[in-house]
Amino acid sequence: MEDNTPRQRDPISLTSVANGLENMGAELLESLEEGRAPGSDSSPAEVGGGWSKAGPEHLGRRSLQPALRVRRFCREHTQLFRWICTGLLCTAFAAFLLIACLLDFQRALALFVLFCVVLFFLAHSLLKRLLGPKLLRCVKPLRHPCLNLWFKRGLALAAFLGLVLWLVLDTAQRPEQLVSFGGICVFILLLFAGSKHHRAVSWRAVSWGLGLQFALGLFVIRTEPGFIAFQWLGDQIQIFLSYTEAGSSFVFGEALVKDVFAFQVLPIIVFFSCAMSVLYYVGLMQWVILKISWLMQATMGTTATETLSVAGNIFVSQTEAPLLIRPYLADMTLSEIHVVMTGGYATIAGSLLGAYISFGIDAASLIAASVMAAPCALALSKLVYPEVEESKFKREEGVKLTYGDAQNLLEAASSGAAMSVRVVTNIAANLIAFLAVLAFINAALSWLGDMVDVQGLSFQLICSYVLRPVAFLMGVAWEDCPVVAELLGMKLFLNEFVAYQELSGYKQRRLAGAEEWVGSRKQWISVRAEILTTYALCGFANFSSIGIMLGGLTSMVPQRKGDFSQIVLRALCTGACVSLVNACVAGILYVPRGAEVDCVSFLNTTLSSSSFEVYQCCRQFFQSTSLEFSPEALDNCCRFYNHTICV
């Protein structure tokens, strides 16, 4: 008799999945290797050993013995395999580098230099690990207080005499450099006059910070290897950023990317932010930040947290750098908080660096300005707000940098691109708002000026008069001071993005060989003025950044909102002065290069189209009574420009 009772289905068990047994083959290998039954936590001894003697299981175990041995061998010699793979990769790279150098050393020079730099730091790390304690024991007898004091005094005296000798010999050829030196003195005296605690100023931090800034500027601007290296680095960044066009053209179309500012410049920020996030994930950014902060902390005597924040500001923005030291913000002193704010105002973010380079701003000057601003920000911050409290972070052992939350390289790249969307929309919104406000202010000022017969009254005109002494103290020629003062006003009262965009317009007109004056309006400024302005604009020190800074820090440490509000204006003024002092240092060190030096050779060999160099040399040619130019140079100059000598 058949049973018509409905049969109940056996329930589906998810035990194996819950226990992590999705891969049954891997589980079988593990169970056989450990000597237990598959799917069981018991060993053969516990279950009587019956399963191991069974036919199919026993045969399966014997057939898997080679795989088990290979797996066990690999597990026991993991470190050896890593060393072998590393050795093979290094050997392959060395062979590749050798072949590249033999074929064309000039073409492989950049790769060779990078290889030497990496090799130097690896050797330094190895020697520090092996010989560091021994060297410290050898140097310890030299740390006698009296000997240490005389060493510091001798070093300070040598630095002072070297600076005086430098100024005497170098400024004899270019007296305008003395104006820039006077500007540094004026800005430092003004900051010292507004210092919170005059008697507590650490002159060690101030002098070492300015000294490091000057040394970096000397290497980048004056020495040939430094100048070539930073020019090469700037060129490589420009080439790297040009790949943005592939992605933006696909999304927006080639016509929009070429003709519309938002689709041409803003995608660069997305791409650069993605690259920075990847570098942060692999740990390269943290390594560079730690090395820079170690140098500043060892020389200037600052604390670990404030130094890390300022070093991080070279690469990230004013709200991202404090994230490096977020766990320590609640316990930092007011002086350390002031340093954090000043560092944020004195530098620009790495992602925005790409946008400014896309404007045509000199990449080497932007990179140098960002690096030089770090020690200067520490120095001037300690001048304005000296330390009078006991810091908890005098040593760097207790301070650690995080490596982010990304689990893999793709997630790091994706999160970097996603985070940049907020930056891009913020920039676009600010540009729309600020340019609209500027147009309204100019219209209102023009309306008010017409009532008293003052024609052309505008915000830029007011800034050109009010800030003209500041531009002159930077070392800018007096005829270029009105334009530079306008740009400084835009940076301070609007933002640096608008100012750099305006500066790029002046540079493009200069490179196109346009006339210098159209009526009473200057169409471009000299190369020296452009370089100094690039340094002076490199920073977030503007009134619109106050809210950004307060909002970012308050979200991390809400209980210290009162402390942040108390010192934010002082930090803003200090950050603005850091950029100005940076420009003054560049003014002391700047020397003309290229056609600006030898116009005779330039005009006698190269003159095919109008450019700034052609304009400058032709103007010098028209005004000269002693220089010898070829008749062809005269004909070419007269073809581009009108002069009485051409008749």
Curated annotation (Swiss-Prot):
Cytoplasmic face residues: 1-79, 128-146, 195-200, 283-293, 360-365, 446-456, 558-568
Residue ranges crossing the lipid bilayer per the database entry: 80-103, 109-127, 147-166, 178-194, 201-221, 261-282, 294-317, 337-359, 366-385, 423-445, 457-478, 534-557, 569-591
Catalytic activity line of the entry: uridine(out) + Na(+)(out) = uridine(in) + Na(+)(in); thymidine(out) + Na(+)(out) = thymidine(in) + Na(+)(in); cytidine(out) + Na(+)(out) = cytidine(in) + Na(+)(in); adenosine(out) + Na(+)(out) = adenosine(in) + Na(+)(in)
One Pfam family hit: Nucleos_tra2_C
Regulation: Due to its high apparent affinity but slow transport, adenosine could act as a negative regulator of pyrimidine transport under some conditions.
GO biological process terms, semicolon-separated: cytidine transport; nucleoside import across plasma membrane; pyrimidine nucleobase transport; uridine transmembrane transport
MF (Gene Ontology): pyrimidine- and adenosine-specific:sodium symporter activity
Known function: Sodium and pyrimidine nucleoside symporter of the plasma membrane that imports uridine, thymidine and cytidine into cells by coupling their transport to the transmembrane sodium electrochemical gradient. Also transports adenosine, an atypical substrate transported with high apparent affinity, but low maximum velocity. Therefore, exhibits the transport characteristics of the nucleoside transport system cit or N2 subtype (N2/cit). Involved in renal nucleoside (re)absorption.
Originating species: Sus scrofa
Protein name stated in the entry: Sodium/nucleoside cotransporter 1
One Gene Ontology term, aspect cellular component: plasma membrane
Region Disordered: start-end pairs: 34-58
